Regions:
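Bacterial Sec-dependent N-terminal signal peptides
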Residues: 1-5, 11-48
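Residue-level detector of alpha-helical transmembrane segments in integral membrane proteins
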Residues: 6-7, 162
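Metal-centered catalytic cores of metalloenzymes
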Residues: 28-267
Length: 267
């Protein structure tokens, strides 16, 4: 009897070892092949974006700064300004202009050269009387700061000269001409009785399309509402480049407030 048990144990032990080793092998994932490694690496690169910070300035009781987010190949994804929550309190009781530079990556990949942030404490009657509430004018300029500051007041011919047909959106109408800013263009559905919480204003100078300007009221920006809207585009563009087709307003989980341009398309 003992011999039989010993004989069974002799064969049972190797069998158990084989079963244990087999089970252990099943617990390990299969090795990644060179082909799947390359494919996974490529997929990772496709989803990779880089954000570059521009100027940071004091606004109200907080700060604001510019930024650009690009793909790994340098294609612009989002360009804009971000405000800390404190920046929306302690603002001046009179109008206040600010200037912020973009990171050089933005200058290389978009037509925009600098951002002019305008705080309008009591609103203003123009364009077309729709902006009487306290708001921010966020102008993305396609010209240098020096060129912009040299824009003369009307009746100088250069500020009154309009772009050729097709170089501004067909559903925008020309409006106020302001020194150091240029000629404003507003959507043609505005009326003097319209009260605007947010929209897109465009600009021109000396026959050229020179800025895009999301306008957002203080109350809208502070509310944390999310907005993402397309805006009308010209039929033609004087210079090749990546131009945005949407403006966005939103708030993140850290209570930072954003006004940005996205959906860049090569023109």
């Amino acid at each position: 009897m003992k011999k039989k048990n010993l004989y069974a144990a002799k064969w049972l032990l190797p069998l158990c070892l084989i079963l244990i080793i087999s089970c252990q092998k099943e617990q390990y994932p299969k090795k990644e092949t060179f082909k799947t490694s390359v494919a996974n690496s490529f997929a990772d690169k496709e989803t990779k974006y880089n954000t570059f910070k521009g100027d940071e300035i004091e606004v109200g009781n907080g700060y604001a700064r510019t930024f650009i987010t690009q793909s790994h190949t340098g294609v612009p994804q989002e360009l804009g300004i971000v405000f800390t929550d404190e920046a929306l309190s302690g603002l001046p009781t009179t109008n206040a202009p600010y200037v912020l530079n973009f990171h050089h990556k933005a200058l290389e990949s978009t037509p925009f050269k600098h951002l002019a942030l305008g705080w309008s404490a009591n609103g203003h009657p123009l364009p077309v009387g729709a902006f009487i509430l306290s708001h921010f004018d966020i102008r993305f300029f396609m010209m240098s700061l020096e060129e912009r500051l040299a824009i003369p007041a009307p009746p100088a011919p250069s500020i009154l000269l309009l772009p050729p047909a097709g170089y501004m959106p067909a559903d925008y109408i020309v409006d106020a001409a302001v020194p150091q800013i240029g000629r404003h263009w507003a959507p043609n559905n505005f009326t003097s009785s319209s009260i605007i919480n947010h929209t897109m204003i465009l600009g021109s100078f000396n026959g050229n399309f020179t800025f895009v300007s999301p306008i957002v009221t203080h109350s809208t920006l502070a509310s944390g509402v999310s907005v993402s809207l397309p805006y009308s585009q010209p039929q033609y563009f004087a210079k090749h480049g990546y131009y945005p087709e949407k403006y966005n307003i939103y708030k993140d989980e850290k209570k930072r407030h954003y006004v940005t341009l996205t959906d860049f398309v090569w023109r």
